[in-house]
């Protein structure tokens, strides 16, 4: 999900089946990618960019979709952190509203909330399995607590604890309707149909080891066994490739 109006995204997605399905798929292991307006919308509090920058409304907090509350992380995200579209005349950093108005917005946040500032052409990969965050792209990510910045350049890593007290839900389906959960599980099962079973991976590794020993009889026998189980092993310049038989 990407560009548009953050507040429009919040209004359209809040309480919808689509949003529940996204949350459910994430709980089941899917990777979610958000950018621009969408990444603002998923925070605990959203920045009403168009209302401030285009319409001229006063700075205010707008409750967001709060995706990270599922994981006990009170986060808001601001992209276009280092934007310079306004040149020397207008400060368009901090997602076009400028530093002065951003400070006003930041000071409205409740105590204990963290804001993630994303420079342009830069992303933050949050890996909940490893407990690490990695800065990708060309610039940096800024973390703000009580509006005090900590900057992480591209290529750097930091623990997810920097974002808050990360906790998995006690039950994966907590807070999600039965309908959405069942639909998400069905979709995940379909996705997994193409996954290579662990047994095939093990046999392919044994075959590769046999080839390295130049034990061609064993290697051919393992290939035949893999084929008999409905899979094919192909030797490519990048290594072995296991594919399901058509």
Residue ranges of predicted features:
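Short His-Asn-centered micro-motif
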Residues: 2-3, 35, 79, 118
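Short, active-site-adjacent cap segments at secondary-structure transitions
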Residues: 6-7, 39-42, 123-125
């Amino acid at each position: 999900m990407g560009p548009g109006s953050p507040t429009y995204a919040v209004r359209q997605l809040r309480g919808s089946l689509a949003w529940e399905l996204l949350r459910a798929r994430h709980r089941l292991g899917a990777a979610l990618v958000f950018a621009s307006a969408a990444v603002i919308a998923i925070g605990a509090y959203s920045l009403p960019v168009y209302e401030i920058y285009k319409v001229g409304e006063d700075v205010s907090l707008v409750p967001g979709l709060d995706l990270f509350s599922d994981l006990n992380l009170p986060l808001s995200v601001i992209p276009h952190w280092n934007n310079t579209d306004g040149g020397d005349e207008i400060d368009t950093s901090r997602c076009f509203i400028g530093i002065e108005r951003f400070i006003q917005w930041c000071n409205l946040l409740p105590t204990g909330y963290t804001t993630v500032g994303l420079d342009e052409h830069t992303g933050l990969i949050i890996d909940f399995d490893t407990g690490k965050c990695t800065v990708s792209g060309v610039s940096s990510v800024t973390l703000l607590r009580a509006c005090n910045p900590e900057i992480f350049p591209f290529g750097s890593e930091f623990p997810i604890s920097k974002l808050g007290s990360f906790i998995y839900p006690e039950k994966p389906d907590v807070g999600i309707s039965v309908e959405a959960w069942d639909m998400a599980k069905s979709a995940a099962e379909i996705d997994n149909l193409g996954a290579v079973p662990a047994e095939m991976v093990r046999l392919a590794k044994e075959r590769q080891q046999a080839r390295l020993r130049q034990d061609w009889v064993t290697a051919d026998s393992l290939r035949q066994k893999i084929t008999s189980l409905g899979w094919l092993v192909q030797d490519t310049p990048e290594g072995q490739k296991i594919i399901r038989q058509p």
